[in-house]
Amino acid sequence: MNELGRHILAEIYGCDGEILNNKDFIEKIMVDSALKAGAEVREVAFHKFSPQGISGVVIISESHLTIHTWPELGYAAVDVFTCGDRINPWDACNYMTEKFNAKNMTATEIKRGIFEQVVEVKASNI
């Protein structure tokens, strides 16, 4: 089965709340995780919420990494989407999990852009 990309949706639990509320450290971990996976970083944007929590995106040539943190819960929601077969998105997810001092990570991988069977869609008058 050929796909255009792999998209991992990771639920990372039991993380260090101080790490999850440190914007600069989260940005560094996200960029480093992209680089460790072999991706080429293009742009980054991160925002710290009041009183806590961070959302951010790392745009890579191969697609993107995103994060949303809940430091008070020790929880991070992470997406890693990579196009092509040169980058392994699991490398980035595993690196982040380690750096967040997480106790548990569950994840789902979705194959994106599978074109094995073309389905014809017809417009209908509703």
Curated annotation (Swiss-Prot):
PTM annotation (Pyruvic acid (Ser)): residues: S63
Highest taxon in the source lineage: Bacteria
InterPro entries linked: AdoMetDC_C, AdoMetDC_fam_prok, AdoMetDC_N, S-AdoMet_deCO2ase_core, S-AdoMet_deCOase_pro-enz
EC number: 4.1.1.50
Active site residues of this protein: S63 (schiff-base intermediate with substrate), H68 (proton acceptor), C83 (proton donor)
Gene that specifies this protein: speH
One example of a Gene Ontology biological process annotation: spermidine biosynthetic process
Annotated site residues (Cleavage (non-hydrolytic)) in this chain: E62, S63
Function: Catalyzes the decarboxylation of S-adenosylmethionine to S-adenosylmethioninamine (dcAdoMet), the propylamine donor required for the synthesis of the polyamines spermine and spermidine from the diamine putrescine.
Keywords per UniProt: Autocatalytic cleavage, Decarboxylase, Lyase, Polyamine biosynthesis, Pyruvate, S-adenosyl-L-methionine, Schiff base, Spermidine biosynthesis, Zymogen
Reported modifications of this chain: Is synthesized initially as an inactive proenzyme. Formation of the active enzyme involves a self-maturation process in which the active site pyruvoyl group is generated from an internal serine residue via an autocatalytic post-translational modification. Two non-identical subunits are generated from the proenzyme in this reaction, and the pyruvate is formed at the N-terminus of the alpha chain, which is derived from the carboxyl end of the proenzyme.
Sample GO molecular function, one term: adenosylmethionine decarboxylase activity
Cofactor(s) the protein needs: pyruvate
Classification via PANTHER family: S-ADENOSYLMETHIONINE DECARBOXYLASE PROENZYME (PTHR33866:SF2)
Classification via HAMAP family: AdoMetDC_1 (MF_00464)
GO cellular component, one term: cytosol
Pathway: Amine and polyamine biosynthesis; S-adenosylmethioninamine biosynthesis; S-adenosylmethioninamine from S-adenosyl-L-methionine: step 1/1
Full protein name: S-adenosylmethionine decarboxylase proenzyme
